[in-house]
Amino acid sequence: CLKGTEHKWLDLYVLFKNWILPSSAPLETELVGIKFFTAPIQAKAAKADDSVSSQARYHQALKNRYSAEIEVVRGYYTMDTVNAKVVDLTNPERRFRECETTLVWKLEEKQSDVNLALHAYHDAITSSVEQVVIVTNDTDIAPVVEMLKKHTSVTVGVVIPTRKHVRYPNGELTKHADWTRTHITDEELAGSQLPPVVMGKRKPTIKPESW
């Protein structure tokens, strides 16, 4: 939901503590921690020259400001060349196996979904939390929500990471949740920004100019 906005320098803790949870969770909620599942951008796949450094700055800013409250859990990207079928533009109905093959780049994020599933289930069965809130619209996470509801006592909320009327919640994901937040508003994003300079133990982290 941050694509194309000026709100990438997002304060996740403020967003959830001040906006998302008070307006969405069915019961009074105490925010005990945030786990941010991500993967470092590969330089050769970056969309801009400063993408890698900007992401690293953001992760460092979160660590500096919320060392106890936010845990950044990293996966990784793989980038390979693979053969892929090309749609025949002159005959879009042409059968898949009859279409020509070409070599393309395939960029995949690894481990993030697995990490999310394991952390959510671990925190639920060890009674570390009474409620798990998952931010996604990915159907791959639907089994996680279903398992949490079937085999643990935690309340499960789902927040769809989109601005209003951009994407609709996936039914396979939300049907198992206790509650769903369908979007995040521009006002909430704007009101949840880190300061331009985030102080650290050794040196400050400065918001990227492109952000």
Identify the residue ranges that each predicted region occupies.
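Nuclease catalytic cores that cleave nucleic-acid phosphodiester bonds
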Residues: 76-211
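Domain-level signal for Mg2+-assisted phosphodiester chemistry and nucleotide/NA-binding surfaces
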Residues: 1-92, 97, 101-106, 151, ...
